[in-house]
Design a protein with these regions (language model features):
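Short, low-complexity N-terminal tether/leader segments at secretion or assembly junctions of large
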Residues: 1-18
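Cysteine-clustered segments with highest specificity for TGF-beta superfamily mature ligands
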Residues: 10-12, 218, 359-389
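Ligand-recognition surfaces built from glycine- and aromatic
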Residues: 20-41, 45, 199-278, 282, ...
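C-terminal interaction-tip segments
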Residues: 114-137, 207-210, 247, 251-255, ...
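Localized edge beta-strand/strand-to-loop motifs within extracellular or lumenal beta-rich domains
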Residues: 169-187
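Extended, solvent-exposed segments with strong compositional bias
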Residues: 323-373
Length: 404
């Protein structure tokens, strides 16, 4: 029997090894560059489509239950039908681009009936403004697609002959790797084989993609309402930052003071992360970090979340200090004179998050630390704080870290 003794392990030499491609394989001090993956977002569908992690859309309308977007035997499955010819599964989070770090999107997919009439399937990262993704069209061919500033700037056929036995109708793993920095290259992989490169260095006079902080998106759509087999099956999905780390956040906060409340579930503060910034989808996520509550009476504050403005009555939402520091909006007249406080909320429609009980005139604080347990505010989300005091006066402060 042979073994490797701990005091004298086998020597390891990197001399003569191929250590990366190109000439930038060492840092400024001559230390070999090493790529360590750091997952920014991942999704699995073992039991269901987790609503806290994914949005579902049918015909452009967000839905909260669906018979066309389901979990089947651990896979997410999107299947069109008459009247539901455009389906989207989209991650809640838009993982931020980490400067000077590579981005890697990864998934596993299979697409039955690859030439189904009028059927188009897509998987990758995208919004209406930016994106890079695979597209399977009804000609049975795969395409590499890139979008910037709302315009599809590239749709290029992918040659798959180098992938042994490739069949898009069977389960394969797909990766998209890109450098960005505003002008880097994009590489498409199938089963770990490089099948297509968008070689852009030294060719552009604009950004290769106007926004690199994008959600994972899977789509199935058909121009023929009678086609019922336009489907995409998904194993899991991930966005990784190569050599990445915990994302830096920019501090923001909002407060409401001297808010008279009397009765159950009266609104004290509403926060809103707008769906759009200008005409583009807002991909900045805010993570709630700190909060404090006070009332002249012993009472309970409750924190809720919703995506429907119809659940809130009477409010006018304005970005604090005129949007100088953040696009996050609130109904606090203390933050902006143009705001109007909400007068009522329909709590039956809201997602309950947390409750804090305070003694009369004794401030209580609740922190939400940086961890894998996140309370986030993504594009289109509302956070509502309510109070149940009898003739009380409330003060609330919320602080958040925003991915900019």
């Amino acid at each position: 029997m042979s073994y490797i003794p701990l005091p004298n392990p086998l020597p390891v030499s990197l001399t003569g090894q191929t250590l990366g491609t190109g000439d930038l394989t060492e840092d400024a001090w001559g230390v070999q560059k090493v790529s360590l993956p750091y997952s920014l977002f991942h999704g699995m569908f073992t039991f269901d489509i987790p609503a806290k992690m994914w949005f579902m859309y049918e015909g452009g309308t967000q839905v909260y239950t669906s018979t066309n977007i389901v979990s089947t035997d651990g896979a997410a499955v999107l299947t069109t039908s008459a009247g539901k010819t455009a389906l989207i599964l989209e991650s809640r989070l838009c993982p931020p681009y980490q400067p000077n770090r590579g981005v890697l999107f990864s998934t596993a997919v299979w697409c039955p009936s690859k030439t189904a009439t009028g059927c188009v399937r897509e998987w990758g990262v995208q919004t209406s403004g930016s994106g890079v993704f695979f597209r399977l069209k009804s000609d049975g061919l795969l395409y590499a697609v890139r979008r910037s500033v709302g315009v599809e700037v590239a749709e290029e056929v992918i040659t798959t002959t180098g992938v042994s036995g490739f069949d898009v109708q069977k389960g394969n793993i797909y990766d998209i790797q890109y450098q960005w920095r505003g002008g880097g290259n994009y590489k498409f992989f199938i089963n770990n084989v490089l099948v297509h490169t968008m070689s852009l260095l030294g060719t552009l006079t604009a950004l290769s993609m106007s926004n690199p902080a994008l959600p994972i998106v899977f789509k199935a759509s058909t121009a023929d309402a009678g086609v019922a087999n336009c489907a995409i099956h998904i194993g899991c999905a991930d966005i990784t930052s190569e050599n990445g780390s915990i994302t830096e956040e920019q501090w923001g906060s909002a407060y409401a003071e001297n808010v008279a409340t009397n009765g159950a579930d009266k609104p004290v503060l509403v926060l809103h992360n707008p769906l759009l910034i200008g005409a583009m989808v807002n991909t900045r996520t805010a993570h709630l970090r700190t909060s404090s509550f006070n009332n002249t009476k012993k009472c309970t504050f409750k924190i809720w979340r919703t995506r429907s403005a119809g659940d809130i009555t009477g409010e006018t939402l304005v970005a604090g200090y005129g949007g100088k520091y953040s696009h996050i909006q609130s109904d606090s007249t203390n933050m902006n004179a143009g705001a109007v406080r909400a007068t009522a909320v329909t709590v039956a429609n809201l997602e309950f998050i947390y409750a804090v009980t305070v003694e009369a005139a004794v401030r209580s604080a609740q922190d939400f630390p940086v961890s894998h347990l996140e309370l986030n505010l993504v594009r289109g989300d509302y956070i509502v704080v309510t109070n149940d005091s009898v003739n009380g006066v409330s003060d609330v402060v919320f602080g958040w870290g925003e991915e900019v």
